From Swiss-Prot:
This is Ribose-phosphate pyrophosphokinase. The gene is prs. GO terms for molecular function: ATP binding; kinase activity; magnesium ion binding; ribose phosphate diphosphokinase activity. GO terms for biological process: 5-phosphoribose 1-diphosphate biosynthetic process; purine nucleotide biosynthetic process; ribonucleoside monophosphate biosynthetic process. Its cofactor is Mg(2+). Belongs to the ribose-phosphate pyrophosphokinase family. Class I subfamily.
Length: 310
């Protein structure tokens, strides 16, 4: 087993290797003067079980091309099996036709990864579970819920916690966390009038006196969560904390979170935190290295990955 990484999230790749007690593979990923990407694998991978850790996060297109070229380099170097480890799968929100004459980009990206030569995909909290079916190769979608649930238990009295979905579409994810915490569930019903804007409408469930835990897979602009926090506090919640798997945090999201009613935003390191995120007073990062590392180990040993969530 050998683990390699592109440039998107080397800190996470190094942490995964530390968990596995293996060195990070020696590979060069650089750009020519015209910004073409060049990859060179600097050690023998012939006959090896290779894992490439690469989030296709901002800049998504550059990191995607790095991944594709690394897969191609491994295939041409006679690796026995190539697993693309995608802590964050970019383009996942483009999982359906949004209107006439629009693409399904998530499917296209899945095809590209497959055609480049990947034999298997390992990813975390896909935006929509059915994206697994976009790949024509085995795909394991891991869940961050055990990590998030453990952190909630470490920081809150679960007897007073209520898990809240920020929209109707996230109810399944919220229910899974509430089951792990053995607590009640509430829903924020919102209306999105136009792209980039969200308006909180009302809260379904009695949150009065509760420590509310908002749960979602992605925070991008932060508008939905900040508005949801305000609505919950108006309904009598004692505090509101958001637990989000993927901290995209584009544009002015970090500043928006910092000035919001959120007690804290907890994200994973599926996307490498920026300096702004690391210095924010109310944003905290929890590691997925153990989860991803164990999944990689089980894959290499031909053991069950689903057993991680039993």
């Amino acid at each position: 087993m050998k683990v390699f990484a592109g440039n998107s999230n080397r800190h996470l790749a190094e942490a995964i290797c530390k968990y596995l007690n293996v060195p990070l593979g020696n590979a060069t990923v650089k750009r020519f003067a015209d910004q073409e990407i060049f990859v060179e694998i600097s050690e023998n991978v012939r006959g090896e079980d290779v894992f490439i850790v690469q989030s296709t996060s901002f800049p998504a297109n550059d990191h995607l091309m790095e991944l594709l070229i690394m897969i191609d380099a491994m295939r041409r170097s006679s690796a026995k099996r190539i697993t693309a480890v995608l802590p964050y799968f970019g383009y996942a929100r483009q999982d359906r036709k949004a209107g006439p004459r629009t693409p399904i980009s998530a499917k296209l990206v899945a095809n590209l990864i497959t055609e480049a030569g990947a034999d298997r995909v390992l990813t975390l909290d896909l935006h929509a579970g059915q994206i697994q079916g976009f790949f024509d190769i085995p795909t394991d979608n891991l869940f961050a819920a055990p990590i998030l649930a453990r952190d909630v238990k470490d920081h809150y009295d679960t007897n007073n916690v209520m898990v809240v979905s920020p929209d109707v579409g996230g109810v399944v994810r919220a229910r899974a966390l509430s089951k792990r915490l053995d607590c009640l569930l509430a829903i924020v019903d919102k209306r999105r009038d136009r792209p980039g804007e969200s308006e909180v409408m009302n809260v379904i469930g009695d949150v009065s006196g509760k420590d509310c835990i908002l749960i979602d897979d992605i925070i991008d602009s932060g508008g939905t969560l900040c508005n949801a926090a305000e609505a919950l506090l108006k309904k009598g919640a004692t505090s509101v904390t958001a637990y989000i798997t993927h901290g995209v945090l584009s544009g002015g999201a970090v500043a928006r979170v910092a000035s919001s009613k959120l007690r804290e935003l907890v994200i994973t390191d599926s996307i490498q935190p920026t300096t702004g995120v690391q210095s924010a007073h109310n944003i905290r990062v929890v590691s997925t290295a153990g989860l991803l590392g164990e999944a990689i180990n089980r894959t290499a040993q031909e053991q069950s990955v689903s057993g991680l969530f039993d």
